[in-house]
From Swiss-Prot:
The lineage of its organism: Archaea, Methanobacteriati, Methanobacteriota, Stenosarchaea group, Methanomicrobia. Keywords: Amino-acid biosynthesis, Arginine biosynthesis, Cytoplasm, Lyase. This is Argininosuccinate lyase. The gene is argH. It comes from Methanocella arvoryzae (strain DSM 22066 / NBRC 105507 / MRE50). GO terms for biological process: arginine biosynthetic process via ornithine; L-arginine biosynthetic process. It catalyses: 2-(N(omega)-L-arginino)succinate = fumarate + L-arginine. CDD domains: Argininosuccinate_lyase.
Amino acid sequence: MENKEDILRRGRLAAEKKKEVGEFTASIPADRWLFPSDLLVDKAHTVMLARQGIIAKEDAAAILKALAAIEHEGVDAVNIPAFEDVHMAIESKLIKAVGENAGGRMHSGRSRNDEVATCIRISARKELLGLMADLQDLRSALLALAEEHKETLMPGFTHLQHAQPTTLAHHMLAHASSFGRDFERLADALKFVNISPLGSAAFASTGYNLDRDLTAKLLGFDRPMDNSMDGVSARDFILDLTSRMAIIEVNLSRLADELVLWSTSEFGFIELSDTYASTSSIMPQKKNPDVLELVRGRSGTVIGHMMAAFTIVKGLPYSYNSDLQEVTPQLLRAFEITRSSVRIMAGAIQTITVKKEEMRRKSTMGFTTATEIADTIVRSTGLPFRTAHGIVGRLAREGGNPSLADVDRASVEMIGKKVSEMGLTEKMVEEAKDPWSNVERRSIVGGPALKTVEKKISTERKKMLLDAALLSKMNDSLEEAYRSLDREVRSMTEGQE
């Protein structure tokens, strides 16, 4: 049966689409996400059409007023499931409101191909800037924790074995550095997102005299894309964004994994706030780090969305294919998970309880000061490091609290000489065994010494201020573009009945 109200199918297709076909081809969550962006695109395109004399100003005014009403009513009012997608749902509601003679002109010189590509970029841009702001909050939380624990000793690990003494500040600053790089990667990604496909039409552009520079400017883009086929078919920006989010998720997962371990009885370094924990349905004593486990687990989900996007795009010929519809939800879910995970992690860090004494107590377990004892032997005796390494390795077989006599015995076994006769003293050995002395001696760039850590915190805070200024500039530029669009809309609708 023919559906004459379906403005898209009524011309070429005589039969109404089956319900199961409509359900199969629908992309409702992604369409709802794109709804605000589609209205922006419709407004900018309509303003440009009127400016270029392609449609009458009276028709443009009617269209813009109807779009304002649709925006006010919200996404639920357009009844997306009744149409192929949000784009046709909006256009159909528009035509129903103002008639086809006016409303039917809005799509002049435009295809859904360039329309949806533009909408995705606008929505992705908003999420990208939001994720950058979320990362700023997480970095701030990590720096605050580092500031509070500049002198909190703890064991550092390699292979998850006690390795050398460090501080909680030094450890948290490592994570802060990784999330700082994540911010830089996102800032860099904007240049690949912020270019406008609008005006590419189906793929070969259009015979209408469109002003693509104007629509790009009104929508906050840096410039129009200069190949119309690339404009409608390019999804490499999605591959790029999901890749960068996958890296963020890996960094989040590593931090979450540590915090889960540290909250166990075996480590006993931290306790999570009750807000970020759950209990057992059978074991009443349990306090489970479910939230952080989900942060860790969902990193795999985001990596999966990245791989799905790559796998879908890799086999597609230019230009547009409906397979691309399956890529957008991968981006949407990746943003949803990554943004929520970053926010959750920031909250967990802000409310964490650090068990300083337990960290300090375990900072020397596993003979973590062995490296400093070897270094002290080198500095005091002139022996090669590899020789000193062997001497201290002998001591490690016997435990981790050697006296000068113990070091002498091991050195006699190794080289036939006592290191005490070569310049090593009992005081030197005792200082080398002290975990705080170990930390303070590591004062070069990147080390855990107090002054070095304080300098790193200061450097990170300054960098965050610069990043905040960059983010503010990006948002301000976007807001100014939208204000320009609003002014154009008002100038065309004021005084029009």
